[in-house]
Amino acid sequence: MPSRIDPERLRNSLPALSEAVAASAETLHYQTYYGLDLPHRTQVQRRLGRFRVHDYDVVAQAWWPEQPHASLLILHGYYDHMGLYRHVVDWGLEMGFAVLACDLPGHGLSSGPRASINEFAEYQAVLSGLFEQARQLDLPRPWHLLGQSTGGAIALDHLLHQAENPDLGRTILLAPLVRPRAWLRSRISYELLRRFVQQIPRTFSENSGDPAFLEFVQSQDPLQPDILPTAWVGALSRWIPRIEGAADSTHAPLIIQGEADMTVDWQHNLPILERKFAGAEVLRLPEARHHLVNEREELRQAYFDFLRERLK
């Protein structure tokens, strides 16, 4: 049975992220349930709070090791939330980074219609808000940006369309979304359905080689949405041409892509990203599926080693 976590009640009880207050029992329960308390890291400070973006209350968390020398800002994927990213948080702390993450609107503890968004431009507003939180917390520069799937889409959109950010370090794209797999069929289905239904039931996929993770997400995670809103698909369909039509960039992201990924159309996406970002460095993992943040340990270590060499 999933743990009893009431996201609305917990969110409403939280202070602003910029305020340092003692964690409530409900906050501690949430962090312990998802392993975000990281009990083996006894010298790490952590904080859970919220900030406002448009009409959304966005819930965020920060972790500080002793004497951090840079920061890692994390953007999760569609249907995900911060609670599923403990491996990346732990790796960031091991690297000596302060770590900052948030739940996107409609996900995890943040407000908004479940698993939906009006336009992908709202995700850019959330990223701008996350940067502002990093400034208020005075997180050490540079700020490395890591995005998984839709989080990677948000990050690459920022690189392609926003002014140069002097605080930004390297950008890490894990299985980044440009087009999902079978996009033409999905788009036709969307056009047929959007006038008649607002959502369809979610179909869970085996998007990781870690069976314990798949079991947790499908039966033990109380923050998992169980619908696919047609509004989100519509927002995606309007966003894809913005990315595919964008001018090339001088940024040099680090791209990790699994070749067993059945969620995004990586054979289409990778050539586009390699054209947009001529300086990109790409690591392809033949056995890795889509959810790289929660792949088998040996696959996680393979890309952590790749990143460590480039961020040390």
Regions from the PLM with identified roles:
Residues 69, 77-80, 259:
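Active-site glycine-rich loops that stabilize anionic/oxyanionic intermediates
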Residues 146-231:
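Alpha/beta-hydrolase-fold enzymes
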Residues 89-113:
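Conserved alpha/beta-hydrolase
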Residues 251, 265-274:
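Short alpha-helix in the alpha/beta-hydrolase fold that links the catalytic acid
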Residues 1-52, 58-64:
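An N-terminal hydrophobic leader/cap segment in hydrolases
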Residues 280-312:
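Catalytic active-site module of serine/aspartate enzymes centered on a nucleophile-bearing elbow/loop
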Residues 249, 255-261:
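Short beta-strand/loop motif that positions the catalytic acidic residue
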